[in-house]
């Protein structure tokens, strides 16, 4: 291919175009990163700073416990640049379906855009798939127009159990799955691949407990569409800086 010669003005314009293109790519990646703020010690000042960072950086979401939803909705303001997610029955999923449904409705009333609900792990381990399916349907009905994501705690599941719960979720119309809460360790890349192989394009996969930009890129390459991290602002800033 013949090399194209550019004068100084054209070269400047070309470099500016590349910079903008790189920045757009970085911003799109940052929009896939969600800020996890579900530690028991997360206080008001940390939540306020987190919401400011999430708005400024245009992160994908701020993920909090139900008791922080109203406060974060206030901190994010009337024109938020990020979404607000409530993590229900975190991290063990041991609440009854009735309690989970009530918590989902309350979180939506308080201002969340999406809810993440942890699966009833014990029911999965016991093979009570009827309970799992009924719960998924009840949660789907409770969310109405709001988005629903199911945390499947894949580290606790055997391969056959993982396949089964993913299939049930997809059949119930659930369009987003979270690999794990992080309470039992982060999801390995082969688990992301395994989930992707089951759900195909029916569900978006959220890979959690990602701590570095390299890990973000690896998880996305494995099929994840969303990233959860306690280090979301730092990762986002590094991503944007690399695009300059």
Task: Tell me the role of every PLM-derived stretch.
Residues 64-83, 94-99, 122-142, 156-162, ...:
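Active-site-adjacent beta->alpha loops and helix N-cap segments on the catalytic face
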Residues 86-90, 110-124, 171-186, 208-244:
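Glycine-rich phosphate-binding active-site loops on the catalytic face of alpha/beta enzymes
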Residues 1-48, 193-205, 212-244:
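Alpha/beta catalytic cores of nucleotide-metabolism and tRNA/nucleoside-modifying enzymes
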Residues 2-109, 168:
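Conserved N-terminal beta1-alpha1 strand-loop-helix module at the mouth
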Residues 95-106, 157-168, 197, 201, ...:
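Catalytic cores of alpha/beta
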Residues 34, 72, 107, 150, ...:
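Conserved, mostly hydrophobic/aromatic
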Residues 29-37, 61-64, 82-90, 115-117, ...:
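Hydrophobic faces of well-ordered beta-strands that scaffold small-molecule active sites
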């Amino acid at each position: 291919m013949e090399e194209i010669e550019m004068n100084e003005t054209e070269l400047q314009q070309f470099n500016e175009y590349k910079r903008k293109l790189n920045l757009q790519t970085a911003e799109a990646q940052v929009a896939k990163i969600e800020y996890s703020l579900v530690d028991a010690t997360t206080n008001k000042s940390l939540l306020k700073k987190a919401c400011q960072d999430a708005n400024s950086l245009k992160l994908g979401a701020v993920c909090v416990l139900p008791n922080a939803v109203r406060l974060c909705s206030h901190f994010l303001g009337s024109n938020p640049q990020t979404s607000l997610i409530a993590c229900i029955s975190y991290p063990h999923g041991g609440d009854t379906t009735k309690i989970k449904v009530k918590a989902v409705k309350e979180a939506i009333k308080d201002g969340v855009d999406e809810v993440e609900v942890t699966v009833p792990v014990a029911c999965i381990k016991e093979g009570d798939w009827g309970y799992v399916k009924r719960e998924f349907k009840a949660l789907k009905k409770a969310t109405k127009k709001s988005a629903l994501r199911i945390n499947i705690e894949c580290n606790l599941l055997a391969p056959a159990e993982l396949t089964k719960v993913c299939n049930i979720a997809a059949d119930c119309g659930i369009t987003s799955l979270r690999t794990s809460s992080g309470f039992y360790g982060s999801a390995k890349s082969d688990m992301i691949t395994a989930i992707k192989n089951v759900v195909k394009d029916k569900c978006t996969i959220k890979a959690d407990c990602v701590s570095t930009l390299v890990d973000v890129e690896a998880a996305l390459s494995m099929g994840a569409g969303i990233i959860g991290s306690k280090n979301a602002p730092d990762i986002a800033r590094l991503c944007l800086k690399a695009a300059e």
